[in-house]
Amino acid sequence: MLQPVWHACILAILGVFIFHVGEVRSQCWESNKCTDLSSEDGILECIKACKMDLSAESPVFPGNGHIQPLSENIRKYVMSHFRWNKFGRRNSTSNDNNNNNGGYKREDIANYPILNLFLGSDNQNTQEGIMEDDALDRQDSKRSYSMEHFRWGKPVGKKRRPIKVFPTDAEEESSESFPIELRRELSLEFDYPDTNSEEELDNGELLEGPVKKGRKYKMHHFRWEGPPKDKRYGGFMTPERSQTPLMTLFKNAIIKNAHKKGQ
């Protein structure tokens, strides 16, 4: 009773495998192991053959599709096109060298499927951090290269100092070789301050006298100490008008108004 049931179960499993194989179906039936399906051993051998053909012909996707690590050759074929496939001293930083996780390679990780599952996320994070650091380093190097042509790209300690140029004998001779008329024109171009001789004498007398400690020092020898006498008050008040006191003007106006009212 049990043999027909067991035989039917095995045939059902074989049918499921053959249905999923698809293109490999003809290869399973053509193999020598699938010729004898009358016994249980022949059916099991046929199932193993179909399973081997299925694993060999099915497309390989990167990742843990069957909860098993891929073989090393397939991993190299899949990941050899990317730069982050390489591990070891070239891509490890100083921080990774301090830790013990910097020297792992794909062969070591592939031998331990459990470590491959748990360390996948850590390796991905470290790879992203390394790529960000490399990008920042490249950006800094490019910036230093592009900014070295400008004055503000250099450090503060290296300031540009003015170059002292000493006149040579040839320049002195060239200045003496100017004609007299050109020298006069050059001298007329300068703006000399207009000062009165009387004011200079007064200022000279004040400077020669002793300066007391209690008084403030007045800078009479500068132009901005005070305007000349003829330019004070905007020039509209002449000395004649300034001699008339303000009170006399008010008195004269009041007297004139009184005479007009009396008349």
UniProtKB/Swiss-Prot annotation:
Matches recorded under Pfam families: ACTH_domain, NPP, Op_neuropeptide
Signal peptide start-end: 1-26
Modified residues (Pyrrolidone carboxylic acid): 27
Presence of the UniProt keyword Nucleotide-binding in the record: no
Residue(s) carrying Phenylalanine amide: 87
Swiss-Prot/TrEMBL keywords: Amidation, Cleavage on pair of basic residues, Endorphin, Glycoprotein, Hormone, Pyrrolidone carboxylic acid, Secreted, Signal
Keyword RNA-binding: no
Modified residues (Valine amide): 156
Biological processes annotated in GO: neuropeptide signaling pathway; regulation of corticosterone secretion
Any single GO CC term annotated in Swiss-Prot or TrEMBL for this entry: extracellular space
PTM info: Specific enzymatic cleavages at paired basic residues yield the different active peptides.
Compartments reported by the entry: Secreted
MF terms in GO: G protein-coupled receptor binding; hormone activity
Name this protein carries in UniProt: Pro-opiomelanocortin
Organism of origin: Aquarana catesbeiana
Gene from which this protein is expressed: pomc
